[in-house]
A protein has these predicted regions:
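Alpha-helical recognition segments enriched in aromatics with Gly/Pro capping
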Residues: 1-51, 164-174, 186, 197-198
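A general alpha-helix detector
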Residues: 3, 27, 42-46, 62-66, ...
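Short, surface-exposed helix-loop/turn micro-motifs enriched in polar/charged residues
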Residues: 11-14, 35, 74-77, 140, ...
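Alpha-helix N-cap and coil->helix boundary residues
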Residues: 14-17, 38, 54, 58, ...
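Short, mixed-charge aromatic SLiMs
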Residues: 23-31, 70, 110-112, 153-155, ...
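Small-residue-rich helix-loop
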Residues: 55-157
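Charged substrate- and nucleic-acid-binding regions of tRNA-handling and nucleotidyl-transfer enzymes
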Residues: 141-199
Length: 199
């Protein structure tokens, strides 16, 4: 609605209008005379604005129209990570793609690029991390972050050298939301199961 209005009408440089503003500000004298051009990127940017300002529970309702077999556990995980994912998502399709690591069933299929970094040494490190995670009493992003950083320091490893293999095992890819958010939203039991599937 917002984008369609701006195709042939303008009010200065303003791009985003509420329903009330559209009604109040619209005037026939501000309708452009030149042909309108469909700008997909601008449309996506406007869509991102509305996605960011949509409640997570409302987004979940839309997601469930496509993903009809979500369990209650998956829904809970999705609601937990949606605030992070919706910041950069421009379409519902992008959101669902970003949530695929939650929607996938175990065992998670690891893509070829991810397999390359899962060396024997990396798997040994993940095994150590798993044991530390099992002892974590309070499961949240701040405690998970501290645990992983402490491990990287104690083992004299770059953080990416533990984050990438862990991300590969938990999501099957090397690109996903922050590793802390992934661990947090999946929950301790699911994280341990996914690590065990691969190790």
């Amino acid at each position: 609605k917002n984008y369609l209005l701006r195709l042939g009408w303008s009010h200065g440089d303003k791009e985003i209008f509420s329903q009330e503003e559209m009604i109040k500000l619209f005037s026939l004298k501000n309708i452009g005379k030149s042909s309108s051009r469909l700008d997909i990127e601008k449309l996506k940017n406007i869509n991102n604005h509305y996605i960011k300002n949509t409640y997570e529970k409302d987004l979940l309702v839309i997601i469930k129209k496509s993903e009809k077999t979500l369990s209650k556990v998956q829904e809970k995980s999705i609601l937990k990570i949606l605030p992070e994912i919706k910041k950069s998502s421009k379409t519902i399709v992008e959101i669902i793609a970003s949530l695929s690591f939650i929607i996938k069933e175990r065992p998670i299929k690891i893509n070829e690029d991810s397999k390359k970094i899962l060396t024997l040494e990396e798997k040994k490190n993940i095994e150590k991390i798993k044991k530390m995670l099992q002892t974590l009493d309070t499961w949240d992003t701040s405690n998970i972050e501290q645990l992983l950083k402490d491990f990287s320091i104690s083992e004299e490893l770059k953080f990416k050298d533990i984050a990438l293999p862990l991300r590969a095992i938990l999501t099957g890819t090397l690109s996903s939301p922050s590793i802390y958010n992934i661990l947090d939203c999946l929950g301790k039991d699911e994280v341990i199961k996914r690590i065990n599937d691969i190790l």
